[in-house]
């Protein structure tokens, strides 16, 4: 991360203020302040993680994935009891993404749900949409199958199973 001395001074002051305002995370902010003040370039890369960029195409893909889960849940509600018994209800829960490898995606989902108020019916679970295992490849396969369904918001039990097993 390239920064002028003036930018480093401003960021250092921000970290100092944050350490005063948030005593629970004071050590974290003091550490970051030291890194910025002293210009430790190896460690300044950590700052890039906090200022990520999620392109519009990826944002739309995440929304499509969440919309697919919404459609699956609503379709499941419309099934009769006999058809619903053949659908694994646990697999209708949107788990989110892996914080270790898909952190930007987890944070975007949290933003959509918490800040934008979208998909309030999704259960955040204990891990707040951290699936604790990579999910993007699985969701992409599911999206392909879902998009091939003729009635995406009125899925049959068989279509639900095909999507989940993609």
UniProtKB/Swiss-Prot annotation:
Disulfide bonds: none annotated. InterPro entries: UPF0304_YfbU, YfbU_alpha-helical_sf, YfbU_helix-hairpin_sf. SUPFAM superfamilies: YfbU-like. It holds the Pfam family YfbU. HAMAP family: UPF0304. NCBIfam families: PRK05445.1 (NF003936). Belongs to the UPF0304 family. This is UPF0304 protein VC_1871.
């Amino acid at each position: 991360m390239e920064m002028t001395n003036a930018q480093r001074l401003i960021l250092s002051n921000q970290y100092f203020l944050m350490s005063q305002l948030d005593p629970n995370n004071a050590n974290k902010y003091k550490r970051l302040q030291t890194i910025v003040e002293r210009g430790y370039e190896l460690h300044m890369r950590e700052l890039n993680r906090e200022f990520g960029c999620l392109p519009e195409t990826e944002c739309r893909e995440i929304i499509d994935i969440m919309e697919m889960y919404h459609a699956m849940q609503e379709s499941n509600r419309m099934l009769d009891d006999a058809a619903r018994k053949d659908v694994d209800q646990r697999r209708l829960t949107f788990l989110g993404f892996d914080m270790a490898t898909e952190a930007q995606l987890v944070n975007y989902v949290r933003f959509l749900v918490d800040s934008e108020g979208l998909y309030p019916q999704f259960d955040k679970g204990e891990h707040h949409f951290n699936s604790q295992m990579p999910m993007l490849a699985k969701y992409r396969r599911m999206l392909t199958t879902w998009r091939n369904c003729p009635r995406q918001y009125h899925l049959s039990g068989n279509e639900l199973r095909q999507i989940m097993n993609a």
